[in-house]
């Protein structure tokens, strides 16, 4: 396929992350835009169109990330796409992965609440997925995010149906103040284990106040 120059809105870059999201040193590329409206959004600037840092092209991003090339090669690290919801920028990511050095690992921090076509586009490039599942209970998920989670679970089943992909998935199970309990988290974990998920990151959301976001 011919390499194409594509642009995408993004918030910024966080360099030299270690033991945060995959092996080696990684650099986070945070895109603007998200389908969810979480009550305790940890990166609410991704929802505000006035706070887009800038639009970047695939070649411009490559130039930015080549500054970290020695770290990636020395540690087996690479790029983590986050946001916001990075899978909404799957066309951009696909184009970027066609021009990046082959040695760079590609990871995703995602909610999986996107159309299947986005996953199909990025799966050939993905080394690891860090999936923020929120909660598998549909009522809890919708109350917290304002969205349904049917697509999330369907996409997770689809990923797990690919040979070897379960070894590259880490599901994040948050304790969300005022929204779920330890019993809810345990129930989610049991359901996900039954689906074939092997690796989990269970943690507490540390929040100061509820984020007021639009449901549009």
Question: How does the language model describe each region?
Answer:
Residues 95-96, 122, 151-158, 184-191:
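A general structural detector for well-ordered alpha-helical segments in enzyme core domains, enriched
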Residues 11, 25, 43-125:
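Conserved Radical SAM active-site core
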Residues 156-184, 188:
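Conserved strand-turn element in the central/C-terminal portion of the radical SAM core barrel
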């Amino acid at each position: 396929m011919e390499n194409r120059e594509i642009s995408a809105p993004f918030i910024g870059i966080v360099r030299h992350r270690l033991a945060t999201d995959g092996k080696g040193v990684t650099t986070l590329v945070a895109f603007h835009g998200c389908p969810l409206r979480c009550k305790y959004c940890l990166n609410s600037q991704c929802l505000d169109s006035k706070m887009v840092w800038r639009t970047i092209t695939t070649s411009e991003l490559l130039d930015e990330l080549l500054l970290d090339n020695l770290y990636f090669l020395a540690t087996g690290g690479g790029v983590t796409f986050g946001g916001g919801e990075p899978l909404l920028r799957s066309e951009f990511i696909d184009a970027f992965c066609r021009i990046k050095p082959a040695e760079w690992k590609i990871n995703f921090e995602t909610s999986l609440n996107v159309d299947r076509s986005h996953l199909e586009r990025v799966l050939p490039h993905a080394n690891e997925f860090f999936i923020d599942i929120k909660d598998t209970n549909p009522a809890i998920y919708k109350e917290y995010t304002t969205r349904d989670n049917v697509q999330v679970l369907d996409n997770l089943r689809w990923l797990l149906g690919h040979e070897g992909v379960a070894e590259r998935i880490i599901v994040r199970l948050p304790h969300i103040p005022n929204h779920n309990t330890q019993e809810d988290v345990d129930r989610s974990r049991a359901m996900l284990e039954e689906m074939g998920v092997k690796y989990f990151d269970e943690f507490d959301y540390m929040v100061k106040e509820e984020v007021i976001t639009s449901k549009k």
